């Protein structure tokens, strides 16, 4: 993707999020809920954090995108997730799945696969979580991963489920099943705070609310988040200040800041 086109689209979509304040319905984990809500507000969207079965269909009806995060699972949450995804699919609401810990336990892996097969538009996870969706074995410890995915693996997951995949790691891989991009931005500080991956999902879901090319929306969200992370790290003295500065930088992000630092390459 040409950087000039990405800059133009990013300028437009940041402005559209600010103008329309789209509702992003989150069914997410307890650990990340506060941070996810705050980062969604910072980018300009409007978060709803609810998993009550009785109101899911109504909330999906007013949402512009749906984020599913399986970080803290139980049977009630699993039922809420499936209800929400089915409702979103029937209403044309785009869905992002964050398969937290998939590959670490059978429950997480089976839930992630069930949601993916139900029909979502973007899957965002670390590279071990993404590989688990191919039933490939790796080393996934809780929400952490020591697995490195190849471009071909990420492309295969995207083609298998017919969606966009964002596989995070030292280098982030993004694929729609045809092309594969590698993004070399971000900071190691993102790996030192809880909910950093969950917040990334919220930012991407916010772009999905206004940009229906989900490969582009994923690139936009990932680029904004990683560059904001770099900017935050430069002014932070530790992990607590980094978390606050990350949200600050997302609230001030511009296309110019992103393109100035962006290291993006199409590899397939």
From Swiss-Prot:
Keyword Aminoacyl-tRNA synthetase: no
Catalytic activity entry: 5-(2-hydroxyethyl)-4-methylthiazole + ATP = 4-methyl-5-(2-phosphooxyethyl)-thiazole + ADP + H(+)
Highest taxon of the lineage: Archaea
Keyword tags: ATP-binding, Kinase, Magnesium, Metal-binding, Nucleotide-binding, Thiamine biosynthesis, Transferase
Enzyme class at the top of the EC tree: transferase
Pfam families: HK
Listed GO MF terms: ATP binding; hydroxyethylthiazole kinase activity; magnesium ion binding
Binding annotation for substrate: 49, 195
Protein family per UniProt: Belongs to the Thz kinase family.
Name under which the protein is recorded: Hydroxyethylthiazole kinase
Originating species: Archaeoglobus fulgidus (strain ATCC 49558 / DSM 4304 / JCM 9628 / NBRC 100126 / VC-16)
């Amino acid at each position: 993707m040409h950087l000039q086109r990405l800059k133009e689209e990013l300028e437009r979509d940041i402005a559209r999020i600010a103008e329309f304040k789209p509702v992003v319905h989150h069914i997410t984990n307890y650990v990340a809920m506060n941070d996810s809500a705050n980062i969604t507000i910072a980018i300009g969207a409007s978060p709803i954090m609810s998993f009550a079965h009785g109101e899911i269909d109504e909330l999906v009806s007013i949402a512009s995108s749906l984020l599913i995060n399986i970080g803290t699972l139980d049977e009630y949450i699993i039922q809420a997730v499936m209800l929400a995804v089915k409702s979103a699919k029937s209403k044309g609401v785009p869905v992002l799945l964050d398969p937290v810990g998939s590959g670490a336990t059978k429950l997480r892996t089976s839930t992630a696969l069930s949601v993916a097969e139900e029909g979502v538009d973007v899957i965002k996870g670390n590279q071990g979580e993404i590989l688990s969706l191919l039933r490939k074995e790796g080393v996934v410890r809780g929400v952490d991963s020591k697995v490195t995915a190849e471009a071909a693996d990420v492309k295969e997951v995207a083609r298998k489920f017919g969606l966009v995949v964002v596989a995070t790691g030292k280098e982030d891989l993004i694929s729609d099943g045809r092309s594969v991009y590698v993004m070399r931005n971000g900071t190691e500080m993102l790996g030192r705070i809880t909910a950093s991956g969950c917040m990334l999902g919220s930012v991407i879901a916010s772009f999905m609310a206004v940009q229906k090319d989900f490969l582009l929306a994923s690139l936009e969200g990932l680029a904004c988040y990683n560059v904001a992370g770099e900017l935050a790290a430069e002014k932070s003295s530790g992990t607590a200040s980094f978390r606050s500065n990350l949200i600050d930088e997302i609230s001030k992000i511009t296309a110019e800041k992103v393109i100035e630092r962006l290291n993006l390459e199409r590899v397939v």
